[in-house]
From Swiss-Prot:
Family membership noted in the UniProt record: Belongs to the YqgF nuclease family.
The protein's role, per its UniProt record: Could be a nuclease involved in processing of the 5'-end of pre-16S rRNA.
Keyword Cell division: no
EC number: 3.1.-.-
Origin: domain of life: Bacteria
NCBIfam families noted in UniProt: RNAse_H_YqgF
GO molecular function ontology, one term from the record: nuclease activity
Lineage, uppermost ranks: Bacteria, Pseudomonadati, Thermodesulfobacteriota, Desulfovibrionia, Desulfovibrionales
Protein name: Putative pre-16S rRNA nuclease
GO cellular component, one term: cytosol
Biological process per Gene Ontology, one example term: rRNA 5'-end processing
């Protein structure tokens, strides 16, 4: 099964895709938020280009598992996505994926605009790869 991983943000959203076997995640693009309609049009177009069969959205939680403002924004995004697609949508709990991706990219020598261009994609890769590493029995659609 092919999955599309999403690191949702109100300004930029990172997108990753799995291989067709659903075992490895790869960065695909960063979608910059302009209008909601354009954002969803671009996201759905990426899903079609990739022939995705499901979405995996990172759900940021605090250490103790409680929601934050960002968690609520992601949940709202997921509800809007589900109204626009027939594909299943999965939530993957995550903590600090964007910060960890940024640290890794800085260690690789990226900074400034070069870093900004790919950090959200790398966070999406982390989210999707974590999901792909789960046993299928632990994957439940939102």
């Amino acid at each position: 099964m092919k999955y599309l991983g999403i690191d949702y943000g109100t300004k930029r959203t990172g997108v990753a895709a799995s291989d067709t076997g659903g075992s490895m995640a790869f960065p695909r693009r960063t979608i910059v938020m302009t209008t909601r309609d354009r954002f969803f049009a671009e996201l759905l177009a990426v899903a079609e280009e990739e022939r995705a069969e499901a979405y995996v959205v990172g759900l940021p939680l605090l250490h103790d598992g409680t929601d934050t403002l960002t968690t609520r924004q992601v949940r709202n995004f997921v509800e809007r996505l589900k109204r626009r697609t027939t594909l299943p949508v999965y939530l993957m709990e995550e903590f600090l994926s964007s910060y960890e991706a940024e640290d890794d990219l800085r260690d690789a020598g990226l900074s400034g605009r070069a870093l900004e261009a790919v950090v959200d994609q790398q966070a999406a890769v982390r989210i999707l790869q974590s999901f792909l590493n789960l046993p299928e029995s632990r994957r439940t659609p939102a």
